[in-house]
Amino acid sequence: MGAAKIWDATEVAEEAQENGISDIPSSSLAVDISLPLPRMKPQIIGLCKDLFKNWSQLDESCFLVETVSGGITNLLLKVSVREDNGPEVSLTVRLYGPNTEYVIDRPRELQAIKFLSAAGFGARLLGVFGNGMVQSFIDALTLSPSDMRKPKLASEIARQLRKFHQVQIPGSQEPQLWNDIFKFLEKASVLKFEDSEKQQKYDTISFEEVNNAVVELKDLTDLLNAPVVFAHNDLLSGNLMLNEDEEKLYFIDFEYGSYSYRGYDIGNHFNEYAGFDCDYSFYPDKDAQYHFFRHYLQPEKPQEVSDEDLEALYVEANSYMLASHLYWALWALIQAKMSPIDFDYLGYFFLRYGECKRRKEACFSLARSYLTRSGSG
């Protein structure tokens, strides 16, 4: 009975891709994300029983709940269900972190998941609830930052990203990057911290300087006329999964997805080569970037990409790479105030903003030289 219900739920999710998000099972229940897993487990089981009614009479012993990963903005759990001697069925429960609505547009995320899933990206949406969603389980391993840097995987990521950028999401296709950055800047510039040490660090920030940096970069990148695509915007190693047996790569977690600039999504991805330690010496050199670009621009004939197209994307990605640092720096300031997670968000602001300033001169020089030669500057 349990297995049949899960596959029914999957069919419901697929139908919802055509009929709208409201056709997906929903529950008003919420899960207390602050609880340790043993105390959280009864809430997770109760949620699954509420969403999938054919499980409502199952004993709790039929459910196994495990932690898959705990990101900065969400917690991912695997729920395995076995009824009697039937096959085991697995799904994932994603719990939103507290106050993440300040930096994530959840309705936009749910809208995108529906269509990205239909296009073959990510897990299928099986249900939604008060502070999270239930999705199909992906049998794959999360990549490490060093994995992303391997040429074979880099080329596959590039090919998949090209397909991702071709997905059409209904609604406005206006790029949201600068809207989001200016919203973050507005919120970040008026924060007050109860912790005096945090407040002292915060008070050293010149928001006039940050605002000028944002405006100057926007003015420069506007001249590039970069293509607008539906972008993932958070393509770090933790959001890439690989099933080696099937040689299948998965993009997951579309929390920050929006229409944006092609170069931003690529430049942001390159920043993530730095890994969790933020070692930006791992940022890809020109040869590694060109390898990625060839497989992104012409997956079938990567060696036939013109020098002109390679240079244009190189300038685009390395200009918007700076915008990625500004975005996540301001994001971190808001998280420093709103998030209960024990993470040095203020330190992360200074790290990302400092890297932006360090790279600015070289990137601006590259872009201006290109624009002058192309007659666009």
Predicted regions and their residues:
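Eukaryotic beta-rich interaction modules
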Residues: 45-62, 71-74, 83, 213, ...
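Catalytic-loop of the protein kinase fold
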Residues: 230-232, 237
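Juxta-kinase regulatory segment immediately upstream of eukaryotic protein kinase catalytic domains
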Residues: 2-66
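Catalytic activation segment of kinase domains across protein kinase-like and atypical kinase folds
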Residues: 238-275
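ATP-binding pocket architecture of kinase catalytic cores
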Residues: 66-210, 216, 220-228, 245-246
